Every structure is written in C-alpha cells, then in structure tokens.
Amino acid sequence: LDPLMRVGPQADGHRKPRPTERRRGLFRRLGLPEEAERLYPFQLSGGMARRVLVSTALITDARLVIADEPTPGMSLDQALEALTMFREMADQGRGVVLITHDIDLAVAFADRVAVFYAGTTVETLPASDFQTGPQALRHPYTKALWRALPQNGFTPIPGFQPYAGSLPPGCLFAPRCPHRTPECEMAPPPARELRGGEVRCIHAT
C-alpha cells in the first residue's frame, strides 16, 4: 500500500467512475469498518492492511490474481471470508494462485495444489488427494507434510531444508527421505505424470 494515500482510493485504483459502493461492500464482507477508507496505511493493523489488499484484488476484473500469504493477521472468520471470495472468482472462470503455508486452508479452497521443497515443485495434485490421505499422495515430502498436520499426529520431519547455496546434487529431499537410494543422489529427478498429478521422485508409484 502507498503510505501517502488513503486506503479507499487505493482500493478503487484508477477505475472510472470510482467503484465506491462495490469497494464498501467488499470492506464490509472482510470486516473492515466504514471509516477505514479514510485512513492511511500506517493507521491500519497488519490484518486490516491485508484485508485492504485482498479487496484491491477482488474489486478488479483481473483474469489472474496471485495472492501471496493473504490471510496471516486475520481472524479465522476473516480468513475464511477472504478465501471464499477468491473461490468465487475462480468459479467465475478467473485464475487464482494462492501461495500459503496453511495446508488446511489451501486444500479446502483449491482445485489443485503444488507442493514446493527448497524452491522446487516436487508434486502437483488434485486438492482432493490431500484430503484422501497419504495413500493418494505421490512424493515422500508431501506425505511427510500430511503426517505433520495436527489432526494426523503432528509427526515432525527430521532434518532441515538445504540452503540455496548448498543444494544436494540429486533429489533435494534425498538427505531427509527415509526411502532414498543411491540413484536419488545422482541427478535431480524430472517431473513426470502419475495418477492425475505430477511428481519429482523416481520411486513414486
């Protein structure tokens, strides 16, 4: 947000005529008080600022919205409302890319999920596979994430992600993988299609 502009005009953008009523409706849905439109960014809490930013994305007719961690600082109800609005955009045929560490929220609202490890996509899958359980997942890291969720036993993943400057030569997850073989450490595995998704693991079946 521009620190020198009030947040109402920022959310409206350069559209003419100004979509004031539409923006006020979005503010209400996101739990922002009416007077928020007259405030400057420094007068907002972190959660309020994120809700203003969400409204700037929703007020447009953009064909693609990329939302990077849009919900931290929001209450659960506010986060659910924001994600419901993104879901409505997707149902209208627009693209929404949600970047988040909150697996439960992502799985609840997404059509497909891409799992990253050390900056690389290790698996893409239908969100419903994550809800099914580890037998529907493909990559050992994705399965480890599933087991690390509180409702699935909160089992930690041993070890640490590699630093960007010291990546292993083969599979990035191999040093932490209980199923690794010497082949895993020879070269990065290519992405391949498997059971309606894509995976970077030579042993995935």
Question: Which residue ranges define each predicted feature?
Answer:
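ABC transporter nucleotide-binding domains
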Residues: L1-A136, T205
